[in-house]
Curated annotation (Swiss-Prot):
This is Endo-1,4-beta-xylanase 11A. Residues 23-220 form the GH11 domain. One of its GO terms (biological process) is xylan catabolic process. One of its GO terms (cellular component) is extracellular region. It comes from the Eukaryota. Induction: Induced in presence of Zea mays leaves and by xylan, and repressed by glucose. SNF1 acts as a positive regulator through the release of glucose repression. GO terms for molecular function: endo-1,4-beta-xylanase activity. Endo-1,4-beta-xylanase involved in the hydrolysis of xylan, a major structural heterogeneous polysaccharide found in plant biomass representing the second most abundant polysaccharide in the biosphere, after cellulose. It catalyses: Endohydrolysis of (1->4)-beta-D-xylosidic linkages in xylans.
Length: 221
């Protein structure tokens, strides 16, 4: 994201709840989890990015030219620590954008990203602290963190932490094993090391704050 600017708000996104699907899967950590239907639409400034979606099908598309900050996508509310998010599609951007898993914790208030493709690396920002790396889903990810002071958030104007994993081998399809990232981040203070973090929403999203680009994605988990 663009540092010192929060690009998504819980109140700005529509949410419609649906029943979990019947199928189950075993996560990389070995925990059996039930796949759940998309029940949350992330739509912050989507009108500036031609955001279109089919919640039932789990698909969305967006196209932008020099937009204001926007974050759009599909996912779940609340999130959890063991979900494996699957995504596939296309993403192209000239600058200032990510394709990523995105979410928030309620307490401690925290914003997080697992960046799968990008035209701007948030860990390259001078305000970010690179603290380590994690290997997951066929690639190394750089880990960085940052503190936002007195900035808008899902709880109003607050000071809160941000955590990022940025994938070395960019991709437009695959699976994101969230537990691997959360466990790695906990070594650097994420969720104060809590075994069961207090999750707010959790989505696969496209974000941009400049440039031109487009994305079309299918999301499941």
């Amino acid at each position: 994201m663009k540092f010192a600017t929060v690009l998504a708000f819980a109140t700005a996104a529509g949410a419609a709840f649906a029943s979990p699907l019947a199928s189950s899967e075993t996560t990389e950590a070995g925990q059996l989890s039930k796949r759940q239907s998309i029940n949350y639409v992330q739509n912050y400034n989507g009108n500036a990015a031609n955001f279109k979606y089919d919640q039932h099908a789990g698909t969305y598309s967006t196209r932008w030219t020099n937009p204001p900050d926007f974050v759009v996508g599909l996912g779940w509310s609340p999130g959890n620590s063991y979900r494996t998010i699957k995504f596939s599609g296309s993403y192209s951007s000239s600058s200032s954008s990510y394709s990523a898993v995105y979410g928030w914790l309620n307490n401690p208030l925290t914003e997080y990203y697992v960046v799968e493709n990008y035209s701007y690396d948030p860990c390259s920002n001078s305000g970010a602290q690179v603290v380590g790396s994690v290997t997951s889903d066929g690639s190394n990810y750089k880990i960085c963190k940052h503190t936002q002071y007195d900035q808008p958030s899902i709880q109003g104007t607050k000071t809160f932490g941000q955590y990022f994993s940025v994938r070395a081998n960019k991709r437009n399809s695959g699976s994101v094993t969230l537990s691997k990232h959360f466990n790695a981040w906990k070594q650097h203070g994420f969720a104060n090391g809590a075994a069961n973090p207090d999750f707010n929403y959790q989505v696969f999203a496209t974000e941009a704050f400049g440039g031109t680009g487009s994305a079309s994605m299918s999301v499941s988990g």
